[in-house]
Design a protein with these regions (language model features):
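Rossmann-fold NAD(P)-dependent oxidoreductase module
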Residues: 153-157
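Glycine/proline-rich active-site loop of Rossmann-fold NAD(P)-dependent oxidoreductases
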Residues: 359-364
Length: 396
């Protein structure tokens, strides 16, 4: 509200709705409202179930439009976790951006793609591909056909932009076809998923989507094992096959700077784990309408990767680089951001504070444990020394 935006909060209680109203929110949508409380779920697998899932979210979209004069969200800021994320993405208006910085309940994220398509050239411009950057392209997904018109167009677009390209094909025959087209040095290498499977045998898995994961809080050991299996059986074999073609002096692991994803399959979990941390972009150019996509949330938010689609963007943020911290400090100094006072707890209450955060029952956004401060509200080192001196004098 302070920046001239109309903010609607997605909350979990009437009390939180009242609180954000006092902070200037234009409205709120309570996830626990009986009209749609059962709609906040992950996206199902089957196409017919996906259509029903989307219809179940229409009342939420209608409520958003009612509170905003008929509009959906241009921007969504999310951190609530795997059951709220899909509806948060559904609330996005055309060409909207969703950014998220955490997940309080589950890391297996899913969403339904939106309408709209564009050209590979347009998406490379949006992603600001620079000459010399490493690019991975999926070719021939969802088909055994040798000819992939969009894939060939994307190869030409990357070649024109000066990218260092590796192509991943579904089959050996597709690999041989791409190699026969005479792209020369424009295509550094062509990797067949079929060949990786043949070499690695039972140790390689190329899943149709990111497998559902156990609850990280209640089944921690099983959750960690599921993550490890995905890394060992999918990421390492595939990443190694791609990386050997893209390694350079400043990129020894061969991370792609940009990955051209395809709407016809769901390899988003692999792509968002493989693309370069902090600057990597995963882009789509085809229509993703009515299809489900899945990814492992920490790889996007903690590594600040971006997913660029024809009519939507997902951006992870973790406030862990110097540029973002400097920009935040500038905005605070200019009065554009107001820093909420932290909840201060004494040292002996640290276990209870940790438990409250784990259970998602904590009261404040930030907690500070007071180990040695004589009182709160001190603004300088001199004030701190004065308070310490006063305490020492009183002790005598």
């Amino acid at each position: 509200a302070r920046n001239g935006l109309s903010a609607v909060g997605l909350v979990s209680s009437a009390e939180r709705a009242q609180f954000i109203a006092t902070q200037g929110a234009a409205g709120s949508i309570n996830r626990r409202d009986p009209r749609w409380s059962q709609a906040f779920t992950t996206v199902p697998t089957e196409a017919s179930a996906i259509a029903e899932w989307q219809r179940a979210g229409e009342p939420i979209l209608d409520e958003m439009r009612r509170q905003t004069g008929g509009r959906l969200a241009d921007y969504v800021v999310s951190h609530a976790g795997q059951e709220s994320f899909p509806r948060s993405f559904q609330l996005l208006a055309e060409h909207g951006t969703l950014t998220f910085y955490g997940a309080t309940s589950g890391y297996w994220f899913s969403f339904v793609g939106k309408t709209g398509a564009t050209t590979p050239e347009d998406m490379l411009r949006r992603a600001r591909l620079r000459a010399g950057e490493a690019v991975l392209l999926y070719y021939g997904v969802g088909s055994r056909d040798l000819l992939d018109a969009v894939g060939l167009q994307a190869i030409e677009a990357v070649r024109a932009a000066g990218g260092r390209l590796v192509v991943a094909t579904a089959s050996d025959a597709q690999r041989e076809f791409v190699q026969s087209l005479g792209f020369g040095d424009a295509v550094r290498g062509v990797v067949s998923i079929e060949e990786i499977r043949r070499k690695e045998g039972a140790d390689f898995d190329w899943p149709e989507a990111l497998p559902a994961m156990p609850d990280a809080k209640r089944e921690t050991a099983r959750f960690k094992e599921a993550v490890r299996q995905f890394q060992e059986r999918t990421m390492k074999p595939f990443g190694g096959a791609i990386g050997r073609w893209l390694r350079s002096a400043d990129n020894p692991r061969g991370y792609p700077d940009l990955i051209i994803e395809r709407a016809g399959h769901d390899a988003l979990a692999t792509s968002t784990s493989l693309v370069k941390p902090f600057t990597g972009r995963v882009v789509y150019c085809e229509s993703m309408q009515d299809r489900r996509y899945t990814f492992y949330a920490p790889q996007v938010w903690m590594r600040q990767r971006r997913i660029l689609m024809p009519t939507a963007t997902i951006a992870g943020t973790h406030l862990c680089n110097a540029y973002e911290v400097a920009r935040m400090n500038d905005m605070i100094a200019a009065g554009q951001l107001e820093v909420s006072a932290p909840t201060v707890v004494p040292w002996e209450e640290l276990p209870a504070a940790h438990q409250a955060m784990w259970d998602n029952t904590h009261a404040g956004a930030n907690y500070v444990v007071n180990h040695a401060l004589p009182r709160t509200g001190l603004r300088s080192r001199d004030e701190l020394y004065q308070e310490w001196s006063a305490l020492q004098g009183a002790a005598r």
